[in-house]
């Protein structure tokens, strides 16, 4: 089958839910037996989000091949079986970088390099490269229609219909239908203007996904269809769902996937959505109650910074048939005010990744509390590193132990810069990134969770466990349960004399899915449930 292309744009406001809509559509099409690939086009000039502040951009999602990408790719991987790569996310910066490189090589034979056709051709080339081998390629265009940054991308996808044929290209526009409480009415005018602006560019949307607080009445759907030149059945209501994993079911009920396959003339089997129904039922009515997990971090005022993490914890709850309630605690506040009653109602503690010294002493206090009070603990990336520092200080007696990231001249740098990072003077794309193999020690928390001795996980770091201190730490009871053998790099540490205490250098949250929860999150939530049951 010739690859079909679905382009998803957004209008009226940003953060309207294009990523979730795209991911949900991917899940629906996969349930019909189609091979789906996903892609995000980001209009910002940064080459990638790797050096952007979490407060501005939210989470950086890492793929197996080491791409630092937009957090929407996390949605795509969680909702579909698509294995995403560096080709799955590109920015204005990457496009212009490629075109300028070609111009310097002389690829354009002295011609004047312009937005049309050179920039738009490069965008189309990158879309086509990612779509190889797929039945359907879903491409989300970041930003909002009307943004000046988005214009080259919109022009490129406009050209796709002429290039690939009208029957092989579909445009979906996600828009807002606000409810004006003082008037008690839903207003369609913002949607009309957004579609008008899109049509001025040359794109006629085939389907509208209308984000609103309540179901759109039939007469309002008819009005939107009339003014926006779409079929009434192609006006899809999308209200806020009880759980984000209910969105595919809600969009299916509205007929989104039926409209897509009909308009693209694709014959498919009937959708099998039973796995999604099972997930939603477990979220709605868990048999084992709830557990409370504390996330001790420095970006807690913007929880989008921990998007994959919070979702992976939810997946752990699905696997254990319980609801996971998250409490975000500011590590700086713990650093200045102490533990106090922060963990009185908590069943487990998690310290996530991050960069920089700010708030790290608060994380160390939380880790010490988890270790000494026998509370299940999970440390990820920086969280694992701070667990090593805490153990070195409070168990091994190395009082000035620290990471050389924060104190380059400390006497006991139990966490140090990786050897291959020492001569690097550029920040962008230079960390240890992507999937690496890890060998597990039999009988440890990690090995029992995975049920295997060999695993592969995704990384994003520059600093590592300092092997110069391994003998001392191991002699005092800190178990090395996971090792990257090729570089003799410690990947996982544990405290054996503890209900469940594990720190890992990698980011397991990037590989967790609602239909396939990650083994470590499954085990962590199980340990939290066990503690909760014993405290009754």
UniProtKB/Swiss-Prot annotation:
Residues binding CTP: 14, 147-149, 187-192, 223
EC number: 6.3.4.2
Residues annotated for ATP binding in this entry: 15-20, 72
Record region (Amidoligase domain): 1-266
One Gene Ontology MF term: metal ion binding
Keywords in alphabetical order: ATP-binding, Glutamine amidotransferase, Ligase, Magnesium, Metal-binding, Nucleotide-binding, Pyrimidine biosynthesis
Record Gene3D superfamilies: 3.40.50.880, P-loop containing nucleotide triphosphate hydrolases (3.40.50.300)
GO cellular component, one term: cytosol
Binding site for UTP: 14, 187-192, 223
UniProt-annotated catalytic positions: 381 (nucleophile), 507, 509
Residues reported in the UniProt entry to bind L-glutamine: 354, 382-385, 405, 462
Pfam families associated with the record: CTP_synth_N, GATase
Domain (Glutamine amidotransferase type-1) ranges: 292-534
Note: CTPSs have evolved a hybrid strategy for distinguishing between UTP and CTP. The overlapping regions of the product feedback inhibitory and substrate sites recognize a common feature in both compounds, the triphosphate moiety. To differentiate isosteric substrate and product pyrimidine rings, an additional pocket far from the expected kinase/ligase catalytic site, specifically recognizes the cytosine and ribose portions of the product inhibitor.
Family, as annotated: Belongs to the CTP synthase family.
Subunit structure and binding partners: Homotetramer.
Protein name, entry field: CTP synthase
Source organism of the structure: Geobacter sulfurreducens (strain ATCC 51573 / DSM 12127 / PCA)
Gene this chain is encoded by: pyrG
């Amino acid at each position: 089958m010739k690859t079909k292309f679905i382009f998803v744009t957004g209008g009226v406001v940003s953060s309207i839910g294009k990523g979730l809509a795209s991911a949900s559509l991917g899940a629906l099409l996969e349930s019909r037996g189609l091979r789906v690939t996903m892609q995000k086009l980001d209009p910002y000039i940064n080459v990638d989000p790797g050096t952007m502040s979490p407060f501005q951009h939210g989470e950086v999602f890492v793929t197996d091949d080491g791409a630092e990408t937009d957090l929407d790719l996390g949605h795509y991987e969680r909702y579909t079986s698509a294995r995403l790569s560096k080709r799955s996310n590109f920015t204005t910066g990457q496009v212009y970088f490629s075109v300028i490189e070609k111009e310097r090589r002389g690829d354009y034979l002295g011609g004047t390099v312009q937005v049309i056709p050179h920039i738009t051709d490069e965008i189309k080339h990158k879309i086509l490269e990612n779509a190889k081998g797929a039945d359907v390629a879903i491409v989300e265009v970041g930003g909002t229609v009307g943004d000046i940054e988005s214009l080259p991308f919109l022009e490129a996808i406009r050209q796709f219909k002429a290039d690939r044929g009208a029957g092989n290209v579909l445009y979906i526009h996600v828009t807002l239908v606000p409810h004006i409480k003082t008037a008690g009415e839903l207003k369609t005018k913002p949607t009309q203007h957004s579609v008008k602006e899109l049509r001025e560019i040359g794109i006629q949307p085939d389907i509208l996904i209308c984000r609103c607080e309540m179901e759109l009445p039939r007469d309002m759907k008819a009005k939107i269809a009339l003014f926006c030149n779409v079929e009434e059945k192609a006006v899809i209501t999308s209200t806020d769902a009880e759980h984000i994993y209910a969105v595919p079911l809600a969009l299916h009920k509205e007929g989104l996937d039926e409209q897509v396959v009909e308009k693209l003339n694709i014959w498919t089997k009937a959708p099998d959505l039973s796995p999604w129904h099972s997930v939603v039922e477990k979220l709605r009515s868990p048999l084992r109650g709830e557990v409370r997990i504390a996330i001790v971090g420095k970006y807690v005022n913007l929880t989008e910074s921990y998007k994959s993490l919070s979702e992976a914890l939810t997946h752990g709850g699905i696997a254990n048939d319980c609801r996971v309630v998250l409490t975000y605690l500011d590590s700086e506040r713990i650093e200045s005010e102490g533990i106090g009653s922060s963990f009185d109602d908590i069943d487990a503690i998690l310290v996530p990744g991050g960069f920089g010294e700010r708030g790290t002493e608060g994380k160390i206090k939380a880790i010490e509390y988890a270790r000494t009070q026998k509370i299940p603990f999970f440390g990820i990336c920086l969280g694992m590193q701070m667990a090593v520092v805490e153990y070195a200080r409070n168990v091994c007696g190395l009082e000035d132990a620290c990471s050389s990231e924060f104190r380059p001249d400390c006497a006991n740098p139990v966490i140090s810069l990786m050897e291959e990072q020492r001569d690097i003077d550029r920040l962008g794309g230079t960390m240890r990134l992507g999937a690496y193999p890890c060998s597990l020690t039999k009988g440890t928390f990690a090995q029992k969770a995975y049920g295997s001795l060999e695993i592969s996980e995704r990384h994003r770091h520059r600093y590592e466990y300092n092997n110069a201190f391994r003998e001392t730490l191991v002699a005092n009871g800190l178990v090395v349960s996971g090792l990257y053998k090729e570089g003799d790099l410690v990947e996982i540490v544990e405290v054996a004399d503890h209900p469940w205490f594990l720190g890992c250098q990698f980011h397991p949250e990037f590989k967790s899915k609602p239909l396939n929860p990650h083994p470590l999150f499954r085990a962590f939530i199980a340990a939290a449930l066990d503690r909760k049951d014993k405290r009754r």
